[in-house]
Amino acid sequence: MKHEILLLGKIKDSFIAEGVEEYLKRLQHYTKVELRYLKGKGKKGALLSTEQEGELLLANVPANAFVVALDVQGKNLSSEGLAEQVINWENTGTRSVCYLIGGPLGLSPSLLARADLRLSFSKMTFTHDMVRLLLVEQLYRAYTIKAGEKYHK
């Protein structure tokens, strides 16, 4: 199974970029994870509207992918719950899972309507860069739980 994370713009903080790279390296042992950075700004550096961001993200979703939208109003899963979800995807033959992380204004209604799962990490607010790190860490944790390894305590 392949996990693809669609992102608007590059990671700005080097310490977060290093953390993301570390977890991507660790995940190679279990599964394929690809980050795709999309240009999140329009002409002259202006931020795109939520609808424009949604259209850009949706246009880049692979065909037949299971779509997970990271949304503060989404479903809260424990780490074990995410591991169970990964197992379920594998058992049902899901080949591609695509995670969508929107810009600072959130996700468009059309994008949320397309999502097969709306996932929330917390009711708290995080920077979009931090959500990227949290996502790859939680995927790594899910795979170690699935493998019965000791990373998860």
Curated annotation (Swiss-Prot):
Positions that bind S-adenosyl-L-methionine: 70, 102, 121-126
Recorded catalytic activity of this chain's protein: pseudouridine(1915) in 23S rRNA + S-adenosyl-L-methionine = N(3)-methylpseudouridine(1915) in 23S rRNA + S-adenosyl-L-homocysteine + H(+)
Entry keyword annotation includes Endoplasmic reticulum: no
Keyword tags: Cytoplasm, Methyltransferase, rRNA processing, S-adenosyl-L-methionine, Transferase
Keyword Manganese recorded: no
Primary site of residence: cytoplasm
Enzyme class: transferase
Pfam families hit by this protein: SPOUT_MTase
EC number: 2.1.1.177
Transmembrane segments: none
Location in the cell: Cytoplasm
Gene Ontology molecular function terms on file: rRNA (pseudouridine-N3-)-methyltransferase activity
Source domain of life: Bacteria
A single GO cellular-component term on record: cytoplasm
Job description of the protein: Specifically methylates the pseudouridine at position 1915 (m3Psi1915) in 23S rRNA.
Family listed: Belongs to the RNA methyltransferase RlmH family.
Assembly, per entry: Homodimer.
PANTHER family: METHYLTRANSFERASE, RIBOSOMAL RNA LARGE SUBUNIT METHYLTRANSFERASE H
Protein name as it appears in the record: Ribosomal RNA large subunit methyltransferase H
Organism this protein belongs to: Desulfotalea psychrophila (strain LSv54 / DSM 12343)
